[in-house]
């Protein structure tokens, strides 16, 4: 029998696959509806997420919630939110390749358990690691990509933290969200 959510939570809680376990306060597995049809994947926990053990709880999380609400979704209601990394990189630096390699199997297991109908990758780090590309986020926007053996549709948009720094790109993110919503509607 394949391990389920409880086994995954326990494995992440005791994980020592990379050095980030030494500096984290709490690992951040994910949050939301475990029968969700939408999976939102970000980069890594920040300081507030590390303290609370939940992804997207700071200002970027508030913006993500507003973005989801704009397309008729809500955290915890048909939405599950996770990150590439389950532990916070010091100083919120980009994840190192070895850290991603250590953590990605956990996300892949989450995806197996969830079996989402659509994945929304927010930010360059999530997009590049889920799609195995070094392309820019701008080049990958506006297309339906496929993830994994189940060929789950994957849409790319900007990370909410980036949008807080560059609000002029919110219009592009809105276009991405409307595109994701229309792709999802066609899956029904």
Where are these regions (language model features)?
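A polyanion-binding, active-site-adjacent surface
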Residues: 1-188
């Amino acid at each position: 029998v394949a391990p389920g959510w409880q086994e995954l939570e326990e494995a992440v809680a005791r994980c020592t696959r990379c050095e980030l376990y030494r500096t984290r306060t709490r690992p951040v597995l994910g949050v939301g509806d475990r029968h969700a049809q939408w999976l939102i994947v970000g980069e890594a926990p920040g300081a507030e997420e590390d303290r609370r053990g939940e992804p997207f709880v700071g200002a970027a999380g508030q913006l993500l919630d507003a973005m989801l609400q704009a397309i008729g979704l809500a955290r915890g209601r048909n939405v599950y939110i996770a990150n590439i990394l389950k532990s916070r990189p010091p100083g919120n630096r980009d994840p190192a390749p070895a850290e991603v390699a250590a953590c990605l199997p956990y996300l892949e297991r989450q995806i197996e358990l969830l079996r989402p109908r659509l994945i929304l990758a927010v930010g360059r780090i999530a997009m590049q690691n889920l799609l195995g590309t070094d392309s820019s986020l701008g080049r990958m926007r506006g297309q339906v990509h496929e993830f994994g053996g189940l060929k789950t549709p994957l849409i790319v948009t900007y990370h909410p933290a980036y949008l807080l720094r560059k609000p002029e790109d919110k219009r592009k993110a809105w276009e991405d969200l409307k595109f994701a919503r229309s792709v999802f509607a066609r899956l029904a």
